[in-house]
């Protein structure tokens, strides 16, 4: 039977291609496991407010963007969410859609609403009329091909690549008889007859499906969301290409592949689903319009976040012991990561002469690094930036060269052994014969107290070396950005951070996000070396940064899983600092013990801090640490505003003194780099909590690595992105409360506005409510609140129209 389709006007090919490009950019990127970093799952929706994003993601993903109503009702009933918070959220909402009274909002919170439903694809409709899961079948066939195409060396037989993803899929699909076996007659022949380019194939599929131009973008977005992590991995390729000034077509190639499948299924089931498919096309073509429930959910979410800000204000205004003004005995710079906050608080409590500060964990060094005995280049910087400097740990001595050769031989042997274990002809025999050998290692790792294997690479160095002028400029820029221009302690530690876990495919996600998913030790050691350089210090003195001759900078690594700190003092041998280093090691050990005891209260089955190290080496432990769960605030201000306050490991802390930032260049850096990185982290946790099926990685217990790039649940299926459920839930309750990030900055709000005007993509995050922005006064109190569209309102003295009485 010939397939008939609804009549549509002549397609505007340019419009269809533009719709495909917009749909591709609505998908967030997914970094491979080796350098996994947190990504904002709403990256493609930052140009629209939460309620509009809710309407869009309901249409294309069937996903919620807020919690169930009962979650808000519980907080109202407990008093955590007060009438003041509800009133303020109502007042901030769009006047034409907000409920009139607090009472109405409370009643709405008591009413559960239907879960969101996505518009159907042809595969969905075919599944409904046939009783066969065509949606799952299509996902399985695409995943089977994609896991080979994107493979990074895990597969023993390489899949055909072709010049691009679409061409590679055609090579496979024209020989794959699985669709024929499952009754899609002529599928392979149809693929063979399809156009050779993805663009032409997509146009052909659009014509066969009878899509209108108005429906194309939403339909394309729907198909890409249905591909899960595969579409996001393709989006990563586009992201990386654009960082280097080129482009990549893998996302639209996958879109064409998925559209061909729908076209084939429509040919088979058109008589049964014609009317439903026409309705679906009309639904895709409708303008986005948030419902009343979308608006109410957005108001309730805003109210919960205002309640959290009110609680944070109470903590920040609590009194604390002032620090003495004399020269500190120890200064220690940490990454702004929320996991450093409890350690910093514990360390400072040991001696009033200890100062800590926070800065982005790549420490201002945008490096592409090659480790010792390796040719792999690691981008150890925020994924928002391209590397600008190359570094290595190659070393030049005879001993280093011999060690390099030995490590390379060992690495090759390890790879060969791994391939032997996985080979089709040897894998079963391997398990039978060699399995008992691994019992000793399992017992050793499970029972022996955990000790982290530290990085023993030679001292990292700029390769090629930087000229003196570049070294001085870099050192000055970093010190001023850290607000570290004096006085300097005799010992200054630059501490990156990493994690020590075993049997965890997402291990890189526990490392430093500002270092691209790698530990921060290399950046810390490089900066320490730069600041110990006598020529650099001499030049810095001429720029009003005088570093005393007795000040030693030492790189360090904070293990966030065990709270042990490794010092790389051997990089800069200094007998004069032996006593200071010994005292510092004692302080660090004590601070680590205090921090572990605090963290043990939150970790399941970790009654004491002593259990932390054991958990780090437990192959069966799914929660070795909580990582950044609980993150809710970013504070850029002098440390005096947060020192001594218990922020419960929930705040990113960036030292910043606007009085030293005469041209506000440091403020610009903060708003455009660490704030954006923190938003990605915060919103990944948010998305993985409110919609774990769509934005989360599923059950960690079922994860299998595929292609060396990502995880699937079980033995196949779609690539999963986001956080595993165990990263936000302890088995009984949520440990991460889904709150959009509150950004608190001590700086004139006019200066903040000026910078936002120069960066529309950053401003969009605040204009559309994906983050809150508050300006602090000189005492650390929330003084101004950003209201969107460049406007500010007083945060400490609500206007009359925010009074609770006006809504009752």
UniProtKB/Swiss-Prot annotation:
Pfam families found in the cross-reference section: DabA
Keyword field: Cell inner membrane, Cell membrane, Membrane, Metal-binding, Transport, Zinc
Signal sequence region: none
GO CC entries: plasma membrane
Membrane topology field: Peripheral membrane protein
Binding sites annotated in the UniProt record for Zn(2+): 335, 337, 497, 512
Functional summary from the UniProt entry: Part of an energy-coupled inorganic carbon pump.
Protein name: Probable inorganic carbon transporter subunit DabA
Organism: Rhodopseudomonas palustris (strain TIE-1)
Gene that produces this protein: dabA
